[in-house]
Amino acid sequence: MITAKSIEADNTSWAAALNEYETNRAGPLTAPLISTIAFPAMRHFADDWVELIDAADQRDIDQALAPGTPATVRAGYLAQRRYQIPLLRNPTEGAVEVLADSVGTLSVAMQRPLSRGSVRPSSRDIFDLPPLVDPRYCSEPFDCLVLARALLFNCALVRTRAMAELQPVAQEPYFCPDDLSDQRHVTDSRMLELARQYLATEFHPSGSTAMLPLDLGGVVDTELRVYGTQGLRVVDAGVMPMVLGAHLQAAVYAIAERAADIISDR
């Protein structure tokens, strides 16, 4: 990505780049963090997408949940899956995000994960110690299988005529196999291993204080009030019960505007 350090590495002074931006609103400082995104549906990048979704739909849901998950949260997760599985089958709903950063590096991000982690207090005083966060990535195997196929999709993208002219190469330890026709063989071996090993957060947390009925593990009601409290609302991405097939920012703005309307009407 383009940063002060990378600009200096290219023998362009930071002061000159800053002056170019302040004077003309041009130059390397106009480069965004992410320059290009796409949200392909399952059928657009996974040849065996029907088989993958069917297998996930039939799998024991407790595998995807943290040990000791309360019965209400389990019930809420089951309700989410009844909604989420059809979304994965929908040809107009993004299952992953393909994103290119400011220097053209392609990566992928899961948009419809079936795995569930946990966020628990580590102290009676919330300001004393940070919470215990366990994302439990790919506790539902479906997620990493999808990511592995999405990585192969990136390989196909860089072999298109338009991209090939730029002579892109895979960054180690990732690779692009010579033959992309047998997705299952490749993704169930080395590519799947890489997806599991290097999986990391995209720093877009959501869902920790879900808007759901209390008996489905919800934390806030439809007016964003925390159950069992007075005068306490949550107004952020935490109220989203499921990850969106999109970036969160616009949705958070909408939640905030709705919260303002609710509060001003009181």
Regions found by a protein language model. Give the residues of each.
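Mid-to-C-terminal "cap/lid" subdomains and adjacent gly/pro-rich loops that border
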Residues: 1-100, 163, 167-169, 175-189, ...
